[in-house]
């Protein structure tokens, strides 16, 4: 049933989109020359002035709309676009709040973007502003893209609560939104600052068994080894640590980050979201959150995630049993003796199995991936695939000395063969990217792409930042290389989709949220491509290129664990969904109890007892709320989009250029279903996802 639901939703959307595509055209608004960059290196007074100026400018534009009725839809939208551009500093402030090393700067940045969010919420609850904006009713705009922007404007008013009957109710909606914003920020910042550690003597051979000597040496001070809950540390311990007690300890520390404070924060956020949904007439917050996504309803999301979980259940059990055999042998147990593969066991025994059954030596493999060669490989692959050129910039002020800066150009010096360009035909930059790639104290702990500025034709170039926690020195895991490709995909979507956009709302990664991950998930396949890896993966000691035999082993072994990983993703999706479908105000509601209940039904791992607090560090509950399902929904789309590349070649110029210009470059100017139809020529089949879930390529 899940495939039928997913197929019917996608087919319906794409069928509608085919008509809209003809009406709208597949190119963004024609470009005009863009203005210069702003420096990303700012201090507290500079940021505060910039933020105050943005609010002052936006307020003056809004006042002008209230004071004088726009002559038509296009004039209204131009004024609203000016407000959007002015408020764009909030995105940059949000980035700084997550990555800046100075606490005072992080606090100022937080204050800035919260103030901007609160201003925007008040604006879309302002009846006078709404009445000016809605005065045109069903009148047509000058073109299809302007019409789409106008429809989005009215939708934003509706979803903000403008239809509430009284000023008192609208004021209450404002207070709910403001409190959610503040609590979500507190949740995220608590995670960023909550780094936990484990220490032991450097000569504790039993505890440190299996860990790379170089890793141990790098973590030793005065005879004491200190391991943190930062991802590079925990990843290494889970994969190579022979001590189950060490793995369990690190898992417990990592999965308890944020607790107990974030447990109380989450409870309050869930209560506020429930109240928000009830206030606006939705049965629950999940219904509100999914209404503007491709999937359409929370019930469709529930059916989809349950179906994916069911189809992978048998394969996940088979994968787990293969690991149980290794653990039994490790523990000296008889064949068939009951034994569990705990969550902190999986990576260790999977690494052992891949070595034994697929001839994949993970330690050997990691020596072919260092940050610098991985970076050059990703840049080279992106340049070929998206027909771009990257130039390193030095001397550009940033928030930290480790941040790398690149300007982005069309490869041809014009627009790469794809039509109008903000380069203005002069070969100038079309955007800028920042790479903040290594762990440090109080920095965002995960991997993500952040907006610095959205591209707006004739106003500003797109700027984006990739934030990760990869090791600066020492080997990288192949999984980290895959993450590099994934997040760089978002960065390229932001830059390419920011070209020629008249309306800021449509710039960059601006499609429906459950399409957003698809381009990046597709790009993960390049991290397994032999031509791509052979172009940069060289041994850190000898400089020899990665052997084809090792690459073949990597590709064979990559299939193992897919079912378990997918079921775990569906567990996360169900936690995300169910926490927002259930009433958190009923007596006895407990988010941790809900997560435990769902773990029993969906997680491939047994319960870990009371020594972890997963929901306290499930950061997606803040940003994604009910829609974590989007990762697997996007995977279905990614696998469909990958098929033309498999037929023509991963770097086929025609296919890659069509993909760049038909899928990425429109940004949000067209519905995601239109982008799919324009590239594939038909509704995407779920057959590719089905094969992928079954372990095929």
Describe the residue ranges of each PLM region.
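C-terminal, non-catalytic "cap/extension" segments appended to globular domains
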Residues: 25-45, 49, 210, 214, ...
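Intrinsically disordered or highly flexible coil/loop and linker segments, enriched in small
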Residues: 56, 60, 64-71, 86-99, ...
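Short His/Asp/Glu-rich catalytic/ion-coordination signatures at enzyme active sites or charged loops
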Residues: 32-46, 94-112, 136-172, 227-263, ...
